[in-house]
C-alpha cells in the first residue's frame, strides 16, 4: 500500500513499466531520473522539481514473475494540467532499465482536486441534512406548543382534580382516569378534560355530569372497565370511549386518541349490555343452584334481542304507563284532545301544557329552552322518547305522553304514557 502526502498535490500519475528481465526497485528509480534528465530543460527536470516540492516522492511497487519485472509507478504532481501531462509523456520515453529492455505506459492521471470536490459536495450534503433536522421549524413549534399545553393543566374543584382549562367554558367534557391521561390529551389540543384520580368518583365529577355532556374515556384494561361501571352508576354519562385493548390513554398517540373519541358510543348501549350480561349471570347462578338441589327445570323460552350490524344492543321499547295495559284513570282523559291535535302535525313536535296555556315547539327548542320553564303540567311528544330526553325533562314535569319510549331507567316520580294507551 502506497502512502503519500497529498497536501499540495494536484494530480497523481499512474504508470506501468514492464522489463524483459530481472531488475530491482532502485534500478527502476534510477532509470526514471537518468533517462528523463535533460529532456525538457531545468524547468521540468525531475530532480529540480522534487527539490522545489512541485513533484512528490516517486513510489515503485515491483513484482518479478517468470523472468520478467512489472513495476507500478506513482508520481504525485503539483504542476498544472499541461505540465503534468508533459511529465507523464516523458515517462513513456524510458526504454531500458539496467541491462533489460523496458516499456512504460501511462495508465491514468488522477485529479486529486476533483476527488476533493466530490468529497466536499457529499460531506456538505450530510452536514446540511444534519442542520435541517436539528433546526426543524415544525419540531420547534410543536415543542413550544407542548410546553404551553403542559402549563395549562389546572386543579379543579375542592378535590383539586387535574383538568384542562376549558372544563368550565365547554358544554361537554371528557372524563379520564388520571393526571397522565389529562396531560396526554392536552398535548393533542383537547382542553375540556378532567381526571377522576382514584377509584372513588369525586362529587365534582357527579355535579358536572348533571350540567354537561359527558364522555368517559378509559384504559383498555380491566381497571378501566371497573372505573367505567362505577361512573355509569353515579354519574349521568352520555358517551363512552375506550382505549384499544391492553393500552392506556396516557400512551396513545394523537391519531389513536382522535380515532377512539370519534368511535365513542352512547352510554345507553353500554348500560343495556351490562344489564344483559348481569341477567345471564343471574340466570346461570339460579340454574346451578336448582341443579344442585336436584330439581328438574322447565326449558326457558328466551326473548329475542335484536343486535345491530355494529354489535350495539338495540334497546327494546319500554312502555311505562301506570295502568299496565289496563284502562287509564279518568284524570288523563282530558289529554286525549291534545293528542288528536298533535298527531296532525309533523313528527318531532312537542306540545307543552301549563294550565290553560298551550305551546307547540320542536324537540330541539324544548331541550335548548328547558331553563325557561319552572314546571310543566304535561308534555306530549309526537316522537320517540330517549333516555337523554328523560334525563333532561324529569325535573320539569312528572307527566309525559309519547309515541314510543326507548329508555333504560325511569325516574320514580315520572309517569310515561304512550299514544297507544292514551287512544285505547
UniProtKB/Swiss-Prot annotation:
Known EC number? 2.7.7.101
Q: Cite the binding residues for Mg(2+) 1.
A: 177, 219
Pfam families associated with the record: Toprim_4
Query: What's the superkingdom here?
Result: Archaea
Q: What is the designated name of this protein?
A: DNA primase DnaG
Signal peptide start-end: none
Q: Provide the cofactor list for this protein.
A: Mg(2+)
**Keyword match tRNA processing:** no
Coiled coil region boundaries: none
Chain's role = RNA polymerase that catalyzes the synthesis of short RNA molecules used as primers for DNA polymerase during DNA replication.
Instruction: Keyword check for Nucleotidyltransferase, yes or no.
Output: yes
**Which protein family is it in?**
Belongs to the archaeal DnaG primase family.
Per UniProt, the cofactor note for this protein states: Binds two Mg(2+) per subunit.
Q: Name one GO biological process term.
A: DNA replication, synthesis of primer
Boundaries of each Toprim domain copy? 171-245
Q: Which reaction does it catalyse?
A: ssDNA + n NTP = ssDNA/pppN(pN)n-1 hybrid + (n-1) diphosphate
- Which EC class heads this enzyme's classification? transferase
The molecular function terms in GO held by this entry are:
DNA-directed RNA polymerase activity; metal ion binding; poly(A) binding
Q: Which GO terms describe its cellular component?
A: cytoplasm; DNA-directed RNA polymerase complex; exosome (RNase complex); primosome complex
The record ties this protein, via SUPFAM superfamilies, to: DNA primase core
